């Protein structure tokens, strides 16, 4: 991997985890910032959550503010309590790319207490042509993206939590992933890929009509309903 972590932020995270372990409350998820280290770029994009999450204290989902599209929790910003991952029986598909989305999604209903440390910890290197998030590579591996997408649909449908903020965040994340899957299938621009897009939508509609209708009125729906060649080029 070309990724790395910032030493000073790492020390702060270890110190915070140590203090939290000694405290009276159990923290299920520690969140920090990560930085996109793009090859050839002079300016770096920092994924931070200062306007969305309380800082330097334990909080619950009810205090999580709306995250705009493009801002969501990725594996690079999340440290789960190990026992929680065992409790939720998280099992990632083997020999499959893009499972980091499942790691950042499936355990969330089990997370009750969160903590946000505003440090730029993880450095996520992007921009290489052979990376899994490169468009051409994603199109080549689209079946794996679809598999992960369907598992996220299942996880959202099976989520028993009644917490509105949690469900809203999970839907927003699912919306983004479904939009990405559909855009990649359209960009592939083959009969087979367009058929796979239809099959993905049919899967969602069959599993849960309410989720399907909600997606049709979200970012996914707006992108998929762009008129004429504009929509197809997306």
Predicted segments, located by residue:
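Amphipathic, well-ordered alpha-helical segments in soluble domains
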Residues: 120, 148-152, 177
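Secondary-structure edge/capping motif, primarily at the C-terminal ends of alpha-helices
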Residues: 156-160, 184-189
């Amino acid at each position: 991997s070309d990724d790395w972590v910032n030493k000073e932020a790492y020390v702060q995270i270890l110190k915070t985890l140590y203090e939290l372990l000694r405290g009276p409350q159990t923290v299920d998820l520690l969140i920090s910032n990560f930085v996109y280290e793009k090859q050839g770029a002079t300016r770096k994009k920092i994924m931070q959550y200062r306007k969305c999450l309380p800082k330097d204290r334990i909080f619950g989902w009810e205090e999580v503010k709306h995250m705009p599209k493009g801002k969501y929790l990725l594996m690079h910003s999340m440290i789960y309590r190990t026992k929680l991952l065992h409790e939720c029986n998280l099992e990632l598909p083997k020999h499959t790319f893009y499972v980091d989305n499942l790691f950042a999604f499936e355990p969330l209903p089990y997370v009750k207490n969160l903590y946000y440390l505003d440090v730029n910890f993880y450095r996520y290197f992007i921009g290489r042509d052979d990376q899994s998030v490169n468009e051409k590579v994603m199109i080549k591996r689209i079946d794996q993206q679809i598999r992960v997408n369907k598992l996220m649909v299942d996880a959202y449908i099976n989520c028993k939590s009644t917490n509105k903020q949690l469900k809203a965040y999970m839907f927003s994340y699912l919306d983004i992933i479904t939009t990405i899957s559909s855009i990649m299938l359209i960009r592939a621009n083959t009969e087979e890929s367009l058929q796979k897009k239809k099959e993905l939508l049919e899967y969602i509609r069959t599993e849960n009509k309410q989720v399907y209708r909600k997606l049709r009125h979200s970012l996914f729906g707006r992108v998929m309903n762009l008129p004429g060649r504009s929509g197809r080029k997306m």
